[in-house]
C-alpha cells in the first residue's frame, strides 16, 4: 500500500470550512481563540490496483470533517463539522471535483512514485558472528545481522543442524538506515558443541530463494588446524605456480641458445 499526504486543501473549500467553524463557535457561545491552527490534509491510498482519496479538515489538532472517496461524500467527524459537511454535500460541483481526485491525482502520482517505492527491491546482505569469543560448551549469543534491504518486510530464522530453533531467539525492531533501506539483528542464545552447524536463513521479496549463512562450532585447536591447513594449501599452490613458471622459462632459454 502506498500513501501520499499533501498538507494543503483547495482554497475555496478550506476558507469555507474555516468560516463555518468560527461561526459555529460563535453560535454555540464559545469564544474564538486569539491563536488557532486550521489544516487541510489530502491523502492517497493505493492498494491492489484501487485508489482511495481522503481529505481531512482539522481545527486545533482535532479533525472535524472529511471527504472519503469510498463513501463519495463529506462526513462530519465531530459536531463542529456538521454544518460544513452538509453545505459541501449540497454543492454538486464540489462533490464531482472530489470524486474525480482518485483517478485525476492519486493514480497519476502512484504511476510516478510506484517504481521508487512499491516496485523497488534491494537484496539484503547477511553476516553471522558470535557476540563474543569463547570456548565451546559455554553460553553465547549468535548474531545474524541482515542489512541494506528494501522493502522492510523480511523473515529471519535460525536452524541448528538442520532443525529450526524457536526458543532463545531475540530480534531487534526494524532499523531504518536513512537511505531507504533497513537492517535487523536476530540473535540466538546457544551453548555450542563441537561440530554443531548453525544456519541463519533469510527470506525477502527481492530474493528468488532464501539466503543461508552458516556458522560452525569449532574449538580453538580445530580452528587453528583448519587455518594452518588452508594456509599450507595456498602456499603449495604458490610454490607449484612458481615452479611451472620457472620450468617454462628454462625451456625458452634453452631453445634460444640452441
Swiss-Prot record:
Changing residue 98 to R: In allele DPB1*11:01, allele DPB1*15:01, allele DPB1*69:01 and allele DPB1*74:01. Changing residue 94 to L: In allele DPB1*03:01, allele DPB1*03:02, allele DPB1*05:02, allele DPB1*06:01, allele DPB1*10:02, allele DPB1*11:01, allele DPB1*14:01, allele DPB1*14:02, allele DPB1*15:01, allele DPB1*17:02, allele DPB1*20:01, allele DPB1*22:02, allele DPB1*25:01, allele DPB1*28:01, allele DPB1*29:01, allele DPB1*31:01, allele DPB1*34:01, allele DPB1*44:01, allele DPB1*45:01, allele DPB1*50:01, allele DPB1*52:01, allele DPB1*56:01, allele DPB1*57:01, allele DPB1*59:01, allele DPB1*67:01, allele DPB1*69:01, allele DPB1*70:01, allele DPB1*72:01, allele DPB1*73:01, allele DPB1*74:01, allele DPB1*76:01, allele DPB1*78:01, allele DPB1*87:01, allele DPB1*91:01, allele DPB1*92:01 and allele DPB1*95:01. Changing residue 38 to Y: In allele DPB1*01:01, allele DPB1*03:01, allele DPB1*05:02, allele DPB1*06:01, allele DPB1*09:02, allele DPB1*11:01, allele DPB1*11:02, allele DPB1*13:01, allele DPB1*13:02, allele DPB1*14:02, allele DPB1*15:01, allele DPB1*17:02, allele DPB1*18:01, allele DPB1*20:02, allele DPB1*21:01, allele DPB1*21:02, allele DPB1*20:01, allele DPB1*25:01, allele DPB1*25:02, allele DPB1*26:01, allele DPB1*27:01, allele DPB1*29:01, allele DPB1*36:01, allele DPB1*37:01, allele DPB1*44:01, allele DPB1*50:01, allele DPB1*52:01, allele DPB1*56:01, allele DPB1*69:01, allele DPB1*74:01, allele DPB1*78:01, allele DPB1*79:01, allele DPB1*85:01, allele DPB1*87:01, allele DPB1*88:01, allele DPB1*89:01, allele DPB1*90:01, allele DPB1*92:01 and allele DPB1*93:01. The chain crosses the membrane at residues 226-246. Disulfide bonds join 44-106, 144-200. Residues 30-225 are extracellular. It is found in: Cell membrane; Endoplasmic reticulum membrane; Golgi apparatus, trans-Golgi network membrane; Endosome membrane. The keyword Endoplasmic reticulum applies. Changing residue 199 to I: In allele DPB1*01:01, allele DPB1*03:01, allele DPB1*05:01, allele DPB1*05:02, allele DPB1*06:01, allele DPB1*09:01, allele DPB1*09:02, allele DPB1*13:01, allele DPB1*14:01, allele DPB1*15:01, allele DPB1*18:01, allele DPB1*19:01, allele DPB1*20:01, allele DPB1*26:01, allele DPB1*45:01 and allele DPB1*85:01. This is HLA class II histocompatibility antigen, DP beta 1 chain. It comes from Homo sapiens. The lineage of its organism: Eukaryota, Metazoa, Chordata, Craniata, Vertebrata. The gene is HLA-DPB1.
Amino acid at each position: 500500500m502506498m500513501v501520499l499526504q499533501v498538507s494543503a486543501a483547495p482554497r475555496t473549500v478550506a476558507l469555507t470550512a474555516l468560516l463555518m467553524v468560527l461561526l459555529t463557535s460563535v453560535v454555540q457561545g464559545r469564544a474564538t481563540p486569539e491563536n488557532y491552527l486550521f489544516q487541510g490534509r489530502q491523502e492517497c491510498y493505493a492498494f491492489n490496483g484501487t485508489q482511495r482519496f481522503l481529505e481531512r479538515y482539522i481545527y486545533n489538532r482535532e479533525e472535524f470533517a472529511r471527504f472519503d472517496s469510498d463513501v463519495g461524500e463529506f462526513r462530519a467527524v465531530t459536531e463542529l463539522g456538521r454544518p460544513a459537511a452538509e453545505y459541501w454535500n449540497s454543492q454538486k460541483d464540489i462533490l464531482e471535483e472530489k470524486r474525480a481526485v482518485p483517478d485525476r491525482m492519486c493514480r497519476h502520482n502512484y504511476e510516478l512514485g510506484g517504481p521508487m517505492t512499491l516496485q523497488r527491491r534491494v537484496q539484503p546482505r547477511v553476516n553471522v558472528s558470535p557476540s563474543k569469543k569463547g570456548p565451546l560448551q559455554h553460553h553465547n549469543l549468535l548474531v545474524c545481522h541482515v542489512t541494506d534491504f528494501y522493502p522492510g518486510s523480511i523473515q529471519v530464522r535460525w536452524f541448528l543442524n538442520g532443525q529450526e530453533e524457536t526458543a532463545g531467539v531475540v530480534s531487534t525492531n526494524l532499523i531504518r538506515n536513512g537511505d531507504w533501506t533497513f537492517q535487523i539483528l536476530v540473535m540466538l542464545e546457544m551453548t555450542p558443541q563441537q561440530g554443531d552447524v548453525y544456519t541463519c536463513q533469510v527470506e525477502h521479496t527481492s530474493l528468488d530463494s532464501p539466503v543461508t549463512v552458516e556458522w560452525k562450532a569449532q574449538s580453538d585447536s580445530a580452528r587453528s588446524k583448519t587455518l594452518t591447513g588452508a594456509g599450507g594449501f595456498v602456499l603449495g599452490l604458490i610454490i607449484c605456480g612458481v615452479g611451472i613458471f620457472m620450468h617454462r622459462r628454462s625451456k625458452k632459454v634453452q631453445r634460444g641458445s640452441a
